[in-house]
Amino acid sequence: MSSGNQTFLIGKVSATHGVRGQLRITSFSGDMDSFMALRSVMIKKPGGGMETLAVAEAKAHGKKIILSLKGYTDINDVLHLVGREIYVLRDQLPLLSDGEYYWCDLLGLQVMTEDGDILGELVDIISTGSNDVYVVHGGGDKEILIPALDDVVLDVDTVAGRMTVSLPEGLLDL
């Protein structure tokens, strides 16, 4: 079980939005709703360290999030935040149902076949709309794209740090 004090990267400030100090956020969480319940965010400073800022409002805007911070009401107040990463404490994230995971819990898992063959490390997740696709780096330059489907992903064990998959026939030949 993860500690409530653990920080997780959930997005990045991609731009300002309007002139009233709002920020356009690219979400890395895979779940837009996780932003809606946030009370505060931590924004990474250029030299390291974190700055905790109170959230006034977060709302979906297409595939982005529009984030308003308390005390920031003008575009000039937030220009310096563009390009920075956004983190949250684990205890601020909504609880998920069984079989659901935050991307930050999946990244870094060792991916193996049901026969025990190690495919590599899950290094990225691509959101395609219909289903996510897991990017797994094997040895060398080998990259495997695995669809995140119930009949492909057999087991996820975040405590043990592994994911077991049943690859569609011919996937490794691509």
From Swiss-Prot:
Q: Name one GO cellular component term.
A: cytoplasm
- Organism of this sequence: Geotalea daltonii (strain DSM 22248 / JCM 15807 / FRC-32)
Q: What is this protein called?
A: Ribosome maturation factor RimM
Record keyword Transport present: no
What the protein does comes down to:
An accessory protein needed during the final step in the assembly of 30S ribosomal subunit, possibly for assembly of the head region. Essential for efficient processing of 16S rRNA. May be needed both before and after RbfA during the maturation of 16S rRNA. It has affinity for free ribosomal 30S subunits but not for 70S ribosomes.
Residue ranges of every copy of the PRC barrel domain listed in the record: 97-171
State the UniProt keywords alphabetically: Chaperone, Cytoplasm, Ribosome biogenesis, rRNA processing
Gene3D superfamilies in the record: PRC-barrel domain, RimM
Q: Which family does it belong to?
A: Belongs to the RimM family.
